[in-house]
């Protein structure tokens, strides 16, 4: 109370629940996503289906800001330059990001790039790509939407994924 006044601290993992119950994607703001290139390609493909848009409660993501799936931290200076250019040219008012360890090197810099809300949804990016394990906290009732194009899923870095509650859109 002494530090926060009348504001109670909110547990950081609340963003997982807000992602899992689609609350974040139903916000009336322009939403962009920042994540691994391979996963964002899948999300883009899924967003072409009205059924998936309805599931999320979102017509579209305004921006897909991609980072390399692997070795994203190897050249932090380059990564920040690339991110800054894309973020400054984006329409988004809110960015949902799942960037793994890279977050440690970029989150403090992002507020200087553009006045927006940046929410680290972590494995929520995997959920949006239809790749979340239903045993992960908060995602027990999440339905993984997928397309049958197997090539789209080649070389995707999976985080403890076990196929469950999968629904194919095509």
Residue ranges, per PLM feature:
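Short, flexible loop segments at the rims of nucleotide/cofactor-binding pockets, characterized by
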Residues: 7-12, 70-77, 97
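Conserved nucleotide-cofactor-binding alpha/beta core module
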Residues: 34-90
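C-terminal functional extensions of proteins
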Residues: 105-170
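Structural motif
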Residues: 30, 93-94
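Gly/Ser/Thr-rich loops at beta-strand to alpha-helix junctions
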Residues: 36-40, 96-105, 125-126
